[in-house]
Every structure is written in structure tokens, then in C-alpha cells.
Amino acid sequence: MGRGSPRLVLVASADSSTAISYRGRIAPSPTGYLHVGHARTFFTAWQRARDAGGTLVLRMDDLDAERSRSAYAEAALEDLRWLGIDWQEGPDVGGPHAPYTQSQRGGLYRAAWRTLLARGFLYPCRCSRKDLATAAAAPHEADPGPDAADDEPLYPGTCRPPLRGAPLHGAAPWTKAEVEAGGANWRFRVPDGEAIEFADGNLGPQCFVAGVDFGDFVVWRREGTPSYQLACVVDDAAMRITEVVRGADLLKSTARQILLNRALGHANPAWHHCALVVDRNGRRLAKRHDALSLRTLRQRGLTPMNILSAELPVEV
């Protein structure tokens, strides 16, 4: 839960103004083999879609061009089918909201970036990761995403204009020519002190305070690609997702995405954050833990029931 003394409260709830059948999604990132945590979260998403008589969408979140591999994408589809998970829309089966691979949806993300820019929510930032790490006394600045803990340090406001929507060329140290030339990271200016509240379907009421629990965050990178936060919001809206099922490490990302939805005029989906799979020391498992990749566990003779069971040992 968030801290601080908020001056405004944004209570976000799933939009119910239009009757729409359940639409869930699973979004593997092909930067490595799926592990036990992915399996359990994706199975929960599949089960909730099935129980609701709805549609499950598979979206390949492959925006990390340096680490994404087609072999990992193919392995993810195979592992998911082995678990008994099927989907009605996706890169392999098509559907009305294609393409279902993020690297092919760049035009949608750029349009959303332009909308946010025109509405005064963004500003350019020339700070390097080294600058931010030094300012925050943190080892790194992460872009919270499917494979990263949601621990982005607070942005110190180095490049933030004094007022939202202020002329960007008047915000030191940028000149008008530099802004027009691009080559910047673009940050979303959060409403400092506003409490973002939402009800999670699994973990209950949540509250995070903008400017306290999270700060201005990157939505567009200097390389010309969207961040996880922006791409996720754009795709969930375009694909008409009604409930997002994902790991509890992304709770804070939900608060950020609620702000993006409001800025873009999107309805909020419902949220269901699953408990994380941790090791015996309480550390979150990630793709670097090869011993718990589905590939390795399958080779050791484990069955889908073993992997989805709460009794599966975390060190095999």
C-alpha cells in the first residue's frame, strides 16, 4: 500500500458502461524460457477466461529487441500447449485485433505517444541511467515489465518542466531545436500527491501515491520504441481486454497504467494479481533460474500437474 498524505484520490474501477463478454490475455515475453511463475499465472488467466465463458488472447510482448528470440517465442507456445492452455486469438491463430506481436504494432504506440504529447502529459528527458542511479543512490533504473521487479526508483525531476503542458523548448536544458530533433526519453508527468486506488480481484484494495510510491516514468525511449507501460495500455485497450491477470510484482505498474488510461481516455480493465513464486529465501524467481524453466522441468519428467501444484518444490 502507498504512503504519504494525498491531496486527491483517483479510484479506478473496471468500466461497466458497455456490456462486453470476458476477454483475458496472456502475454509472454520471448526473452527466455518460461518458468514456473509464468506457468501458474498464465494458467490462472486461462482458467478465469474459461470459467467466464470468454475469450483468451495470446499477445507476444517482444519489444526488447536485443533479448527477444524467435526460438523463445516458439518454445513459449509449445510449453503453454503442453500445460493444456489454449487461446482463441494470437499470433499463430489470428483474430480481429491482429497483429498480436508487439514489434508489429509500432504505429499504434506512436499515435498514443503523440496524443499524450499533444495533451501536455509528457516531457523530454536527457538523463542517462548513470545520472539517475547517482541521483537516486540506486544500482539501476528498471523499466518495469514482464520480467522485472516493479522497483523503478523515483525520478528526481531533473528535466521536469515547472508546469504541466509548459512549452518544452522553454524547459532547461532543452532548446526548441533539440526537442524537434528527438533523441530523448519521454516521461509521463504524474500528479504528485494523488492517491491511485483500485480493487484487485485477488489481493484486495490497493493504493499507491503518485510522487511518493512512484515518480515520472518513461513511456517512449530515445531509440524510438515505447516502454512496457505504454505498449501494455495501448494493446489492452485495442484488444478490448476486460481483465488483466499478472504477477503481484506489477502492482505498482497498474497504478501507472491507470494514469495512462485516464490520459488517453481508455476504460480500465479489472485486475487480478497472482502471488509470486519464490525460492526458500523468499526471492522472486525469474528467467535466470534455469532449474525452474519449464523446459528443464519437462526434461526431468515433471507433468503439468506437478508444475501447477502448490506443493512443487522451488529448488528441484
Which role fits each region the language model picked out?
Residues 88-91, 268-271, 305-307:
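Short, surface-exposed acidic
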Residues 1-33, 51-56, 83, 171-179, ...:
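Non-catalytic terminal extensions that flank enzyme cores
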Residues 24-27, 58, 95-98, 114, ...:
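Generic, low-specificity signal for short hydrophobic/alpha-helical stretches with a mild N-terminal bias
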Residues 130-285, 293-298:
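Active-site cores that bind ATP or allylic diphosphates and position pyrophosphate for catalysis
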Residues 79, 112, 135, 162, ...:
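Residues that form generic nucleotide/phosphate-binding pockets
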Residues 8-144, 248-249, 255-266:
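N-terminal Rossmann-like or analogous alpha/beta NTP/dinucleotide-binding catalytic cores
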